[in-house]
């Protein structure tokens, strides 16, 4: 490693250890800095050993493991009251973290329910079948309404009940489809219109149909 690269690596690692102010192994530092700074494992090990030899960082040996950390003498002393304030901040942040993790798990569970209920292909097939069934019942209902004495009150009530049931199913499936699409579109790089065109989705609006009022 050239002098310039060695100096750059020393500066990067020293700043990182001082900023983080916590113990690290050479593997930890390599993993955390390699992506952003392109430091090799050998260079990291050598640089940290040199920094420790020069007294710029501290080194502790635990069996075969070496741990490095910032020289604490460079930092100002902290009073008891400041330590209590820091402890309070840690407690508050830990509580917020737990709350955020709980919310995240809940959202992941909701997303899993949405994505596992029906696949896009199954949903589209189901919507198509329901539309066809609704059309048949609408046609049947129209004929019944136009008739005079050909339908008994019981038959008429049955048809109205079926119409109400299938209209509710239509609304329910439409909400389910909307929820699934919204979940998919959160990670989809294009617009909703482009997604619908790519998978061949036709909405009620595309077909100029609306859910009847019941």
UniProtKB/Swiss-Prot annotation:
UniProt-listed Pfam families: LZ3wCH, TBPIP
Function, in words: Plays an important role in meiotic recombination. Stimulates DMC1-mediated strand exchange required for pairing of homologous chromosomes during meiosis.
A single GO cellular-component term on record: DNA recombinase auxiliary factor complex
Segments of this protein annotated with the region DNA-binding: 115-179
SUPFAM superfamilies, per the entry: Winged helix' DNA-binding domain
UniProt xrefs under InterPro entries: Hop2_WH_dom, LZ3wCH, WH-like_DNA-bd_sf, WH_DNA-bd_sf
One Gene Ontology molecular-function label: double-stranded DNA binding
GO biological process, one term: meiotic joint molecule formation
Protein name: Homologous-pairing protein 2 homolog
Family recorded in the similarity comment: Belongs to the HOP2 family.
Coiled-coil portions: 79-147
Assigned keywords, A-Z: Coiled coil, DNA recombination, Meiosis, Nucleus
Locations listed in the record: Nucleus
Source superkingdom: Eukaryota
